[in-house]
Design a protein with these regions (language model features):
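Short, well-ordered alpha-helices that flank and scaffold nucleotide-derived cofactor binding pockets
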Residues: 16-20, 41, 97-100, 136, ...
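N-terminal Rossmann-like NAD(P) cofactor-binding module of classical short-chain dehydrogenase/reductase
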Residues: 65-67
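Anion (oxyanion) recognition and catalysis
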Residues: 19, 139, 213
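Class I S-adenosyl-L-methionine
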Residues: 55-63, 75-198, 203
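SAM cofactor-binding core of SAM-dependent methyltransferases
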Residues: 2-55
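Intrinsically disordered, low-complexity and often Lys/Arg-enriched segments
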Residues: 1-3, 110, 203, 235
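C-terminal target-recognition/interaction regions appended to catalytic cores
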Residues: 148-151, 198-235
């Protein structure tokens, strides 16, 4: 069975989504006692780990998927916009520390996927450099800014560590009567056999760009950016 760990768990949204799709939550991290009491009632078998800053990824049960909806206050346009340097939104780095500790302990086997959710302000905070920092922290590689200077609402980058894809989703199209847009990012790590299987090779991406140029065709900006990155970075 596919297993899941939930960081910044709140009232257990990730866990609820997991059980509805045949995934078993093993553990969660939430520092606020009230929401933790709610998840304790609805998911009594889930191990509650508490404060994320005190968790060692090498010492907790390995899981296939780690989810993290890290605090958005420092990224949101409604806040002071301290970005990832802020005390709350900067907790994202603890999530990635836990991921790396677990992968090192399991020789790269777990987690297989990392899922991150946050506000659209992550695209623009700190002169648009915070989302670049998120991608680089997950991919452990230098990720260039888009040619337009703006992050697309959907995109993909790859590194030797993993393949990363993101997309903006709006709650109103998912059964909730409100307009609420959020970034959802999924990283698939090397070693599980999926990233290379379902992605174009470096040579293929370079060929698409070359033929488009030869024929005078203009590719959509997002597609051209993704192809250019893959043609440059490869595996």
């Amino acid at each position: 069975m596919i297993t899941l760990g939930s960081l910044f768990d709140g009232i257990g949204g990730w866990q609820l989504a997991a059980v509805k799709n045949g995934v078993k939550p093993l553990w969660s991290s939430e520092i606020d006692p009230f929401p933790a009491s709610i998840t304790g009632k609805h998911f009594p078998d889930t191990i509650q780990l508490g404060d994320i800053t005190k968790i060692n990824g090498a010492e907790i049960p390995p899981v296939d998927i780690i989810c993290a909806g890290s605090p958005c206050q420092d990224l949101s346009i409604a806040g002071r916009r301290e970005g990832l340097d802020g005390k709350r939104s900067g907790l994202f780095y603890h999530a990635m520390r836990i991921v790396r500790e677990m992968r090192e302990k399991t020789n790269g086997k777990y987690p297989r996927f990392f899922v991150w959710e946050n506000v659209l302000g992550a695209f623009t905070s700190n002169a648009r450099r915070d989302f670049k920092a998120v991608l680089e922290e997950i991919g452990q590689a230098d990720i260039p800014m888009p040619a337009s200077g703006r992050w697309a609402r959907a995109g993909m980058v790859r590194s030797k560590e993993c393949g990363i894809a993101w997309r903006v989703l709006d709650a109103q199209f998912w059964g909730v009567p409100q307009h609420r847009e959020r970034i959802f990012l999924v990283a698939g790590f090397r070693g599980w056999g999926g990233t290379s299987r379902y992605s174009l090779t470096q040579k293929a991406c370079a060929g698409i760009l070359r033929r488009a140029k030869e024929r005078g065709k203009c590719l959509p900006e997002m597609l051209e950016t993704v192809l250019a990155r893959q043609a440059h970075n490869g595996d």
